[in-house]
Structures are given as structure tokens and as C-alpha cells.
């Protein structure tokens, strides 16, 4: 995770000697030698070059993962199998890609509107983390396919308004009225800041559940 490509500015970072094969006296001649890969998800044996490529694709691209400090071996193995099995990439068809694109665009437009329309108001923007919206919806859809009927969400301030609007289907009009202090209920006994308010909705998944 220390070498994962997660810096959008691409700033240079010092190398880690222990991640260089030469640190273990391995040379270019060793790259095509075949090794047992019992501790890596996938084929039972691979060349050193394939092992390095697979681990790099899994742990050193745009997703960084730090989990080896966990005490529970079964949890570590569970994570390892699921990440290394697909190299931390899921295959999305064009329909899914377009859906994610629309969700992220909607999330970004929502944040931009609030920032421009309610200048100076605290909103704990989701800006920079818009991928949370398709991720949460994907989790809910997956749950629906596993016969889960109820989902209860509890989250911190950051991104909460966006989740209320784009996941919980809370009316943006209602959210904006709350920002403008036009909702009379906010002044009758239960007043609270906008990013503390919740919502309940009936979510219909793609499978109709």
C-alpha cells in the first residue's frame, strides 16, 4: 500500500528497498523461474515475473490496501482471496459503466449546486469521493440479490447530504428548503443542522425487490 498509485499529483516518492527483488538477491535471470504460489490466490505456480505483476496489479495500482496487521488469519485470507482473485478489479459492462458515470455526475452536480447556491453554509461536501454513491448503490443491489430486505445506514457528516439525495431518494427540494431554513418542522422542537437529518425510503432494486 505504500507504493500504491493514489496521489493525483503524481509526486515522486522514495523507493522501498524491501519491495525491490534485488533486495532478496533476485536478478533478471530469476524473473522467468517458476515458483510455488500456495500463498497467492490463483494458479498453483507462476514465474516470478507473473507473481510480481499480479501482486502489483492487486495492491499497487489506484487502490491501496493495508490489512496484514489484522490479528484474525481467516479475515486476512478472506480479503486476500477476494482481492487477488480479480486483481482488485471488477468487470463492468457498458450499461453498468454508464450508470456509474451518471451517478457520479449527479453527485458532482449536487455538490456544485449547494456550494454555489448556499455560499458559506457548511455542507461537508462529498467532493473528491463521488464514487461513494455508485459503491453504496452497488452494495444495496447486491444485498437485494441475497434477499436482504432492510438496510440501515449510519454515517458521519462528510457526504451525508449526497447520500440522502442520491441513495435514500430524499427530495433535493426538501434538502434545499432545509438549507434555506424554509422548513417549518426545523423550528418546532426537533431543529438540527442539515447534515444531521436523516430519511427513510422504500428502495426498489433492479430485480424488483
Segments from the language model and where they lie:
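Extended, charge-enriched "interface" segments that sit outside catalytic cores
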Residues: 1-132, 148, 185
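A sequence-composition feature that detects small, non-aromatic residues
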Residues: 4, 8, 21-22, 107-108, ...
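Cofactor-binding active-site loop characterized by glycine-rich and histidine/acidic residues
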Residues: 152-209
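Structured alpha-helical segments in the cores of large, soluble enzyme domains
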Residues: 97-111, 132-145, 186-205
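Generic hydrophobic, aliphatic-rich segments that mediate packing or membrane embedding
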Residues: 47, 51, 96, 100, ...
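Active-site pocket-lining segments that scaffold enzyme catalytic pockets across diverse folds
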Residues: 113-173
Amino acid at each position: 500500500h505504500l507504493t500504491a498509485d493514489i496521489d493525483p499529483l503524481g509526486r515522486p516518492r522514495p523507493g522501498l528497498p524491501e519491495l525491490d527483488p534485488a533486495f532478496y538477491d533476485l536478478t533478471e535471470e530469476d524473473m522467468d523461474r517458476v515458483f510455488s504460489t500456495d500463498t497467492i490466490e490463483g494458479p498453483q505456480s507462476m514465474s516470478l515475473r507473473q507473481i510480481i505483476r499480479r501482486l502489483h496489479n492487486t495492491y499497487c495500482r489506484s487502490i491501496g490496501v493495508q490489512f496484514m496487521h489484522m490479528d484474525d488469519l481467516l479475515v486476512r485470507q478472506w480479503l486476500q482471496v477476494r482481492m487477488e482473485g480479480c486483481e482488485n478489479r471488477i468487470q463492468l459492462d457498458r450499461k453498468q459503466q454508464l450508470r456509474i458515470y451518471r451517478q457520479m455526475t449527479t453527485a458532482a452536480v449536487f455538490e456544485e449546486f449547494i456550494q454555489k447556491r448556499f455560499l458559506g453554509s457548511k455542507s461537508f461536501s462529498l467532493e473528491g469521493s463521488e464514487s461513494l454513491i455508485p459503491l453504496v448503490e452497488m452494495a444495496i443491489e447486491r444485498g437485494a440479490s441475497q434477499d436482504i430486505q432492510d438496510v440501515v445506514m449510519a454515517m458521519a457528516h462528510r457526504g451525508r447530504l449526497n447520500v440522502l439525495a442520491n441513495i435514500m431518494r430524499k427530495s433535493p427540494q426538501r434538502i434545499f428548503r432545509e438549507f434555506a431554513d424554509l422548513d417549518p418542522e426545523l423550528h418546532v422542537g426537533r431543529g438540527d443542522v442539515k447534515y444531521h437529518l436523516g430519511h427513510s425510503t422504500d428502495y426498489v432494486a433492479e430485480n424488483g425487490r
